[in-house]
Amino acid sequence: TAPTAIRSLIALGDAPLEGKSLDSLRVLGTVGEPINEEAWNWYYEKIGKSRCPIVDTWWQTETGGILISNLAGITPQKAAHATFPLPGIQVLLVDENGIVVEGSDSTKGIPSELVQGNLCIKYPWPGILRTTYNDHERCRQTYFSTYENLYFTGDGCSRDTEGNYRITGRVDDVLNVSGHRIGTAEVENAINMYVDVVESAVVGYPHDIKGQGIYAYVILSKDVTDDSLTRQDILQTVTRIIGAIAKPDKIQFVKGLPKTRSGKIMRRILRKIAEGETSNLGDTSTLLDPAVVNEIVVGKI
């Protein structure tokens, strides 16, 4: 099942489990998005009765199959970790410059500190994608151009001293909402289809149930008089164009967006505000109008 479903059950307490026999369960699975430790432990203790192994798999449509996972009853499991690459899968962590991140693997005599990086794969495997809609160049640019001679998954990842891998989430502007990958640009385009929207910017923020929630900053035309009605209309527009899964969890109406002098939206700032990290917004010296940021912080939902 997906971690989102597990978190939803946790919110209901023990009531859904009362009177249920779970004796026939042998193996549990979690897939679709990274699972947090609280959800993993609840799943293991309440559903699996601390006896059923949890298979936490990592894979993508593009990989054609599971690449990182524990093997039920054979290899060790660890809460919230996909654990080890399957045989033949050469996994690497690299920094933003493509330099391989070493460390945190006691089996190789490397110092024991947690390391993080971008998850890449060094060599091809049987299920690897061959093209993207017969557009080979598009495929190359999307998956193989970020780091030379590596397949870039688009995911961030950490590795511990035993060599266990833990997926930390997407490193680009693709949100993982309840296990569904949703592009922020796609949601923005849908929001902007509504007649009274001038401009919008969408970012993700931590959500207890969904993993990531969708936070939308929206500039409305001056003719709008009823914010609540407009908010509902925007949600309906997004549902119609993309689907209910892409509806913003929070919509904040703003007078302006933080932009550089060249017109680029500073999404980093919007993301920090949505996450509640308003005390450390980083460098704002390149903003065209810094006052916009203060207005957004004050109006944060």
Regions of interest found by a model, annotated:
Residues G32, W59, T83, D155, ...:
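Active-site glycine-centered loops adjacent to acidic/histidine catalytic or metal-binding residues
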Residues F84-G88, I99-Y143, I182, E277-S279:
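Conserved ATP/PPi-binding loop(s) of AMP-dependent carboxylate-activating enzymes
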Residues W125, R130-T131, N149, G156-A246, ...:
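AMP-binding/adenylate-forming catalytic core of the ANL superfamily
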Residues T1, I10-A79, Q90:
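Gly/Ser/Thr-rich phosphate-binding loop
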Residues S24, G88, R138, D196-E199, ...:
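Glycine-centered tight turns that cap/initiate beta-strands
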Residues I273-S285:
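A short, polar/charged loop-to-alpha-helix boundary motif
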Residues T4-R7, E33, P124-G127:
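Alpha-helix/helix-capping structural signal
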